[in-house]
A protein has these predicted regions:
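Charged (often Lys/Glu-rich) extended helix/loop segments that serve as interaction or gating elements
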Residues: 1-139
Length: 139
């Protein structure tokens, strides 16, 4: 499961008269390149709270933080209409290749890998920091 924090929301009119909510998140093609490379299809759901059923659902597309038109993590998904900046989206079944295919594209840091068992949790690999990236720079 990959967890993303919602960083922005924008409703866009479509040619068919409908609309789609674009949901930008704090990750993208640098931590999950599979949708861009292989057209891998995922879904997403709100993980940090129970959405209000009265709010209904809305057609959405989850996009990453990179300046690339192909940075689409979830192409089409119904998400709660009361989705807000700061909400956490869970993208299940991203597979084991997320970390090994991850990159520092655009100088973004790679996410950590966590373990959870019996109510306990910890890092298998901690998230990278900007200091980690800068430590690799030459003189």
């Amino acid at each position: 499961v990959m967890l993303y924090t919602v960083t922005g929301l924008k409703r866009v009119a479509l040619d068919d008269g409908a609309s789609r909510l674009y949901v930008s998140v704090d990750g993208g093609m640098s931590d999950n390149i599979r949708p861009a490379l292989y057209k891998a299809a995922y879904t997403a759901l709100v993980a940090n709270r129970r959405p209000d059923p009265a709010a209904g659902m809305t057609r959405a597309r989850v996009v990453g933080k990179h300046c690339e038109s192909g940075d689409i993590l979830v192409r089409d998904v119904d998400l709660p209409a009361d989705l807000a900046v700061g909400d956490v989206l869970a993208v299940p079944a991203v597979g084991a290749y997320g970390r090994c295919l991850a990159s520092n594209y655009n100088m973004f840091t790679r996410p950590g890998v966590a373990w959870v068992r019996d109510g306990r949790q910890g890092w298998v690999l901690r998230p990278e920091t900007l200091e980690d990236l800068l430590a690799l720079e030459g003189e």
